[in-house]
Amino acid sequence: MKQTVAAYIAKTLESAGVKRIWGVTGDSLNGLSDSLNRMGTIEWMSTRHEEVAAFAAGAEAQLSGELAVCAGSCGPGNLHLINGLFDCHRNHVPVLAIAAHIPSSEIGSGYFQETHPQELFRECSHYCELVSSPEQIPQVLAIAMRKAVLNRGVSVVVLPGDVALKPAPEGATMHWYHAPQPVVTPEEEELRKLAQLLRYSSNIALMCGSGCAGAHKELVEFAGKIKAPIVHALRGKEHVEYDNPYDVGMTGLIGFSSGFHTMMNADTLVLLGTQFPYRAFYPTDAKIIQIDINPASIGAHSKVDMALVGDIKSTLRALLPLVEEKADRKFLDKALEDYRDARKGLDDLAKPSEKAIHPQYLAQQISHFAADDAIFTCDVGTPTVWAARYLKMNGKRRLLGSFNHGSMANAMPQALGAQATEPERQVVAMCGDGGFSMLMGDFLSVVQMKLPVKIVVFNNSVLGFVAMEMKAGGYLTDGTELHDTNFARIAEACGITGIRVEKASEVDEALQRAFSIDGPVLVDVVVAKEELAIPPQIKLEQAKGFSLYMLRAIISGRGDEVIELAKTNWLR
């Protein structure tokens, strides 16, 4: 019996080290499903929704650094992959999506479930190609895999179900050679120019992102040599924050006042491996130097006075011998003092209260009780705020989220991918009640896959971050209310340990119990509804917006909201 196209794909993926494929099966994927069953070396991870499959594959790729795979059946099946694939692509992780298609003879006829996948996936992939004949598959699959790995993003192979069942070309090899990522270092002449510029610069600040992964030692040495405070972006937190005497916190909408003021007061700002997008948080008068492995990132969000293309570790390693050590610490010491004040202010907000459970306190205790090498995932919205401000990184912990794409409902799906990839490590999903309930169907996948993830729901019965933005704009928070749900009872009904927490005095015991259980657990914590995530700088328009919101709330007979807002944030 001749090898089918589907079998060729399965064996090629096996040779590339792929261990699992995430997806929802369907008739257009029958060829692939059958080949995987016969082969027995790649596990099919059956989710309830394809979006979850894409998020899970993205988390796997982010943790392993290797190619991860997801699949969707024709039409609606692979359409459901798109949001998760956008997140993978914008996170720069290598993911291959197999998008099954309708019978090849029916393409263009308006057939049942027909879509145009090549157009639909174009914006969330480096490569998207239709396999219309078996002869194409060796080249198309190899190119797709190579582009996903080397370009760090998504590739999509569109495969009609009938083509998958046809014989593969004779003599097609399934050998996969893993090409290593190139190490890019700027020319020495460019490095000397940068060293000279830094020599005559004062009040230097560093802004660091996820491109600093693996460069912690070089980064700290560089900052120490030029006496520069280090500000980090959210995606840089896990790589930069720990064991760092020069760290002064984050900047941005959910950052620290110390990080914000350090950047704004800098005369020279060095951007290292970051695509920080918020123009309002860049200084207007400073010289800006940018170093990034991706030339397309240069000058994308701010003006740039000097730019070098290179990976951060090798570039700093080559730059360090050329840089003259500075003696003046005034700017650095002021930034560190501001950071200590900002950190104390944030820690003061994370104290237990008899009136309500503050989410800051919950996040702080999660960090305290979690394993030293825990993997955290956090939903977009207020859980990301609390994770950014209160989780302590140590070089072993990881933090995953939808930090570039900003999609709701990412935390639980990413936790599935993380736990499957790292079965011996503790995985903690910090979910909002809005995000968790959006893709709650895959809570059943936790049971089915027997994945011991720990899910903590920040249950405030509101789309918290959206409501806060509406208040800042002066709007009433219509449409943000969520039904008060007991998620612990839902967990128990699904066969998972559920723990309900309604008092701050119960938090520690609940977390300790959850983290000690050898299996999945959901901790449903009722947190303060009107908690504000104060940005590092309050603009006049925001202050006016809050005043207008409070006036409108009182006029509309919703004065109780204003009272609760005051009690939660100012009358503790």
UniProtKB/Swiss-Prot annotation:
Subunit description: Homotetramer.
Site (Moves into active site upon enzyme activation, plays a role in electron transfer): 465
Region Membrane-binding domain: start-end pairs: 531-572
HAMAP family according to UniProt: POX
Protein name: Pyruvate dehydrogenase [ubiquinone]
Xref: InterPro entries: DHS-like_NAD/FAD-binding_dom (IPR029035), POXB-like (IPR047211), Pyruvate_dehydrogenase (IPR044261), THDP-binding (IPR029061), Thiamin_PyroP_enz_cen_dom (IPR012000), Thiamin_PyroP_enz_TPP-bd_dom (IPR012001), TPP-bd_CS (IPR000399), TPP_enzyme_TPP-bd (IPR011766)
Region (PP-binding domain): 335-530
Upper classification of the organism: Bacteria, Pseudomonadati, Pseudomonadota, Gammaproteobacteria, Enterobacterales
Region feature (Pyr domain): 1-182
Main location class: membrane
Modifications made to the protein after synthesis: Activated by limited proteolytic digestion in vitro. This cleavage produces a peptide (alpha-peptide) and mimics the activation of enzyme by phospholipids. Protease activation and lipid-activation are mutually exclusive. Proteolytic cleavage results in the loss of the high affinity lipid-binding site of the enzyme; the cleaved protein is no longer activated by lipids or detergents. The proteolytically cleaved enzyme does not represent a functional cleavage in vivo.
Enzyme Commission numbers on file: 1.2.5.1
Gene symbol of the encoding locus: poxB
PROSITE patterns, per the entry: TPP_ENZYMES (PS00187)
Binding-site residues for Mg(2+), renumbered to this chain: 433, 460, 462
Top-level class of the enzyme under EC nomenclature: oxidoreductase
Essential cofactor(s): FAD; Mg(2+); thiamine diphosphate
Annotated positions for site In vitro cleavage to yield alpha-peptide: 549-550
Entry-linked Gene3D superfamilies: 3.40.50.970, TPP-binding domain
Catalytic reactions on record: a ubiquinone + pyruvate + H2O = a ubiquinol + acetate + CO2
Organism: Escherichia coli (strain K12)
